[in-house]
Amino acid sequence: GSVLVDVHIAVESMITVSEGHQIAEQVRFGLTEQFPEISDVVVHVDAEDDVFDDSLPDRGELLRLLEQCWKEYPPAQNILRTNLHYLNGSIRLEVCLPFTLASSPAEASEIAYKLKRRAMEFVPQIAQVQVLFTTDDD
């Protein structure tokens, strides 16, 4: 006979999807190597503090809200990447901007502060905003 295994693992909440997939593959491989009678393993990866809340806006809706919120703030027009983390019934927002946007650490701090304040006032479900300045352009 064949043995099917269904495993749920909890991972640190801020890891990337690709890292979660890598962890799942390592678990799957480890189980099938250690127990040859296992024919298939399904690994479910969940954030340790992952709680589904249907009142939270989805990505499309949230990005539209942020676009409205930041439309009058020129630095926001340079956002390279936006990552969302749905955790504990709220949203943690991660925004990446080009390093060249700020001419000094003080200016970078001011840009970050204004983006955070506007986002958290406009979208009450946002609990945290992290603004990153990067030299990457992709």
Protein language model regions, located:
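Peripheral (non-transmembrane) domains and long loops of multi-pass membrane proteins
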Residues: G1-D138
